[in-house]
Amino acid sequence: MIALAEECFISQIAEIEKAAFSDAWSEKSLESALLDETGIFLAEVDGGEVRGYIIGSCDGFSGYIERIAVSAAHRKNGIGKQLLSAFENALPETAESISLEVRASNSPAIGLYGSFGFERAGVRRNMYSSPKEDGIVMIKKVIK
């Protein structure tokens, strides 16, 4: 079930974060995101186990996905698409688009985003470190 993330899940989310990203956010950063009233922080939880999460924001017109990850044990089960859909549904009626950046080498994520309607909009050179890599900017129009 996907719902608003809760503080009791932060340690599990941090473990997924560490496994998914070389520049993982700390538990403190995740807690700050949870407390951000302008943010959207959702988690997919089954029987008390966090299987994935998505963190983003919206300025009223543009949604932005900062982080999305699914635990390795639960990938390829549609959880990523469910999280993207839940994020889009959490946006206000005024939202017109969603954007995100993804490592150029992350083909599985690029494929997921493309299957959800995101299109490549540009490249941010050397956006990532550890290892140094370009970021692909992807945007999806929101139709409500």
What does each model-identified segment do?
Residues 26, 107-110, 114-126:
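K/E-rich alpha-helical interaction surfaces of small helical-bundle regulatory domains
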Residues 37, 61, 106, 128-134:
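Short acidic/glycine-enriched loop/turn segments that link adjacent beta-strands
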Residues 67, 71-85, 103-111, 115-116:
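Conserved glycine-rich acetyl-CoA-binding loop
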Residues 91-101:
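Conserved GNAT acetyl-CoA-binding A-motif
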Residues 99-101, 119-136:
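Conserved catalytic-core motifs of GNAT/GCN5-like acyltransferases
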